[in-house]
């Protein structure tokens, strides 16, 4: 094999190798959500497609700890089981929001406990794609959440905003009542996100702190 042919073969092999690496990286990014900034993200796979949510763990740590702990099965109530997997969006109101996270599937269920609100004035229901906690009044948060279709400012101060859609608003708009959460994967990027623990001890500590601050 002459030198020129050898160089061509090596070039083709290198191109294919780099291409495979690029495809693997793209697949990993798709599986983990996006090539995004540091933070904690929830990649929600539904029967309509994927919704990627940025979680505001620094401004609503208790609420995010609860959501992530349920999603990953690290809270005592889950016993190692991903809580949200297989649950439905039981309530959908056009031009308002989609609501899910109820193990009963009818709006009456929850994880078996409640925790206080974290209504940071900087976090508002000011746009489509806001992730917020459903409740039955102050201090009744559990596992149910909703994602807005539009801005809903009348909910400010009444429901805890703890995240926002960064990809998949078209999926949010396509969801209908009865659609399913097939999986909910948590992705951590950056040192602060990786230090954010979401186990039962951390949840209990945060709940105690937020409860004391609200008195």
Swiss-Prot record:
InterPro entries: Cyclophilin-like_dom_sf, Cyclophilin-type_PPIase_CS, Cyclophilin-type_PPIase_dom, Cyclophilin_A-like. This is Probable peptidyl-prolyl cis-trans isomerase. Residues 38-197 form the PPIase cyclophilin-type domain. PPIases accelerate the folding of proteins. It catalyzes the cis-trans isomerization of proline imidic peptide bonds in oligopeptides. Its EC number is 5.2.1.8. One of its GO terms (molecular function) is peptidyl-prolyl cis-trans isomerase activity. Pfam families: Pro_isomerase. GO terms for biological process: protein folding. The keyword Endoplasmic reticulum does not apply. Gene3D superfamilies: Cyclophilin-like. Keywords: Isomerase, Rotamase. The keyword Transcription does not apply. It is an enzyme of class 5 (isomerase). Belongs to the cyclophilin-type PPIase family. It catalyses: [protein]-peptidylproline (omega=180) = [protein]-peptidylproline (omega=0).
